[in-house]
């Protein structure tokens, strides 16, 4: 918002509605979506996408190429590191009949003076009331799955990107979360705040295994300049019990059932004395060696930056 206009920004990870736990009606798309809509006046905006692969250790190449996954002719940005490829696509729309769709031009941006190991992408926008642009960052399908927008059959992992699809993904995601929070049995005071907290707790759960992370943060210091900045993206048995107790009290039991499945799996690989570890990776791994990333500054200069070395190589990025 500024003196000339107001824009509404919506970030979401698409989620299809589901009727029961782990019973998806549609495949999940590994997309990070940002929708920008100007709701009043005119507002200048700058979009920058600058991924840093493997915690800014790996270099990458960036190119702007034709996008075969959309109906009309336009460009997309590709970011390629040794282990991972991402692409950034967009789709435009308008909510007013008298308003035309915005034009988008992607350009390369050199951020090497800030320590980036590959070019970023930038787009300067001047949106007016009713204009909408949605950006989609994703891991593109493998070459064997690629098809152009006119292909008769396409992989479910690579649907044609249209404004109708984006609208459907947003409404489906809203439905999923609304359906989930409706399961709450809480009737006490500050209901809205309690439900907002429940949503935050739900986001700590890694659904493929049922694991619950202590916090979705790493190297966030307890105080500015301090060294107690650990990686909390792992499952502590004790901490998880507190999270699940809160959810159970609110009526959410599926998450507790899933965590018990996670525990039962861990019981198949107990310590020699028959005990469990105090913590595991979200995949159930027992090796949680922590490493320091000395090339990163940390939050407001708080060092060292720490992370666990057990995360999937290539999928750790900084935006």
Regions found by a protein language model. Name each.
Residues 1-319:
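Acidic, mature catalytic/reactive cores of soluble proteins
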């Amino acid at each position: 918002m500024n003196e000339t206009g107001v824009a509404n920004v919506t970030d979401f990870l698409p989620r299809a509605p589901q009727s029961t736990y782990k019973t998806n009606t549609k495949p999940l798309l590994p997309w990070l979506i940002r929708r920008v809509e100007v709701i009043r006046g005119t507002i200048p905006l700058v979009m920058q996408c600058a991924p840093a692969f493997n915690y800014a250790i790996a270099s990458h190449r960036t190119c702007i190429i034709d996008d075969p996954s959309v109906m009309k002719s336009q460009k997309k940005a590709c970011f390629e590191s040794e282990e991972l490829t991402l692409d950034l696509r967009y789709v435009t729309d308008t909510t007013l009949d008298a308003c035309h769709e915005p034009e988008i031009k992607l350009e390369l941006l050199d951020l090497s003076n800030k320590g980036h190991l590959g070019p970023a992408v930038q787009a300067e926008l001047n949106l007016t009331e009713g204009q909408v642009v949605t950006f989609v960052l994703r891991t593109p399908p493998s070459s064997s799955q690629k098809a152009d927008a006119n292909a008769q059959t396409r992989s479910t992992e690579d649907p044609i990107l249209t404004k109708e699809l984006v609208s459907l993904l947003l409404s489906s995601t809203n439905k999923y979360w609304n359906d989930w929070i409706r399961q709450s049995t809480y009737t006490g005071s500050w209901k809205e705040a309690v439900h907002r907290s429940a949503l935050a707790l739900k986001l700590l759960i890694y659904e493929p295994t049922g694991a619950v992370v202590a916090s979705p943060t790493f190297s966030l210091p307890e105080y500015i300049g301090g060294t107690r900045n650990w990686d909390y993206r792992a499952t502590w048995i004790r901490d998880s019990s507190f999270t699940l107790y809160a959810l159970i009290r609110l009526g959410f039991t599926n998450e507790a059932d899933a965590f018990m499945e996670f525990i039962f799996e861990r019981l198949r690989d107990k310590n020699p004395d028959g005990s469990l570890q105090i913590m595991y990776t979200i995949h159930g791994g027992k090796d949680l060696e922590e490493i320091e990333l000395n090339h990163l500054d940390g939050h407001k200069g708080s060092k060292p930056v720490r992370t666990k070395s057990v995360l999937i190589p290539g999928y750790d990025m900084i935006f």
